[in-house]
């Protein structure tokens, strides 16, 4: 009877082990936010013209300053960006990032065709 109990316990343990991924064994699975929740963009168009862009950045996430793109502005016109905080990235090297929020003012009157691009990452390792 004792041998049968040990045999069944070993079988159950091996089934549990077989169902575990070798890459996550003993680790807690990380849940990542969808991109629109990690980096929420709000656009305001003041009466005076131009636009105010505000990204709300979720805790544990950041945007790269160097990966922001503003297409559709008049030639030679670039928005003035806050300096950001220094960050060393293993792929991009020394960079600047934004955490919590980013506000960018576009002074040009006609921004109806503005196209935006950005890249950000989670501290836990997923990049968008």
Residue ranges and their predicted role:
Residues 2, 17-128:
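Structural recognition of alpha-helix starts/caps
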Residues 5-16:
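Bacterial N-terminal signal peptides
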